[in-house]
Amino acid sequence: MSAAAGDEIKRVRVDMFTDGACSGNPGPGGWGTILRWGDTEKELWGGETPTTNNRMELMAVIRGLEALRRPVTVTIHTDSRYVHDGITGWIHGWKRNGWKTAAKKPVKNEDLWRRLDAALGTHDISWQWVRGHSGHVENERADELARRGTSEARQGKVDGQSSTIL
């Protein structure tokens, strides 16, 4: 598809709702993601054991972004201050400091932060923090998916619904 000079190619707008869960910390954990564009929704979930709640929060966003096959405009809704503050602020300093914190300590979950940074790729991203467990419908649904992922991780399953879209 080509665009006339000066015209912008319209990107599909996607809303992504994410959550992570962990039973124990560390322990079995799961992540859940809802992708919505137009009248279409896709649910993704999975889990790991052992893991932590922060790793699952990161995985929810990573797997949602990795499911997108082409550049889109995406608003990521997360109840994780760790993910929100990390990607909108802390990561810039970590990268400048060779993936060390301001206290010169290694960044926790560096592997996933690098993966998230790469997954942002060509997407036009905005971040929206939502209060968890406060009745936000999509956040509650993402939490249910994360709990499903935790349950399946206990049973030895890793991914529930995983695919590429758009």
From Swiss-Prot:
The name this protein goes by in its record: Ribonuclease H
Q: Where does Mg(2+) 2 bind?
A: D19, D143
Tell me the function of this protein.
Endonuclease that specifically degrades the RNA of RNA-DNA hybrids.
Q: Which residues form a coiled coil?
A: none
For region Disordered, the annotated ranges are 145-166
Subcellular locations according to the entry = Cytoplasm
Broad EC category: hydrolase
List cellular component terms (GO): cytoplasm
Q: Which SUPFAM superfamilies match?
A: Ribonuclease H-like
Give the encoding gene's name.
Answer: rnhA
Q: Which InterPro entries match?
A: RNase_H, RNaseH-like_sf, RNaseH_domain, RNaseH_sf, RNaseHI
Species source reads Rhodospirillum rubrum (strain ATCC 11170 / ATH 1.1.1 / DSM 467 / LMG 4362 / NCIMB 8255 / S1)
The organism's taxonomy opens as: Bacteria, Pseudomonadati, Pseudomonadota, Alphaproteobacteria, Rhodospirillales
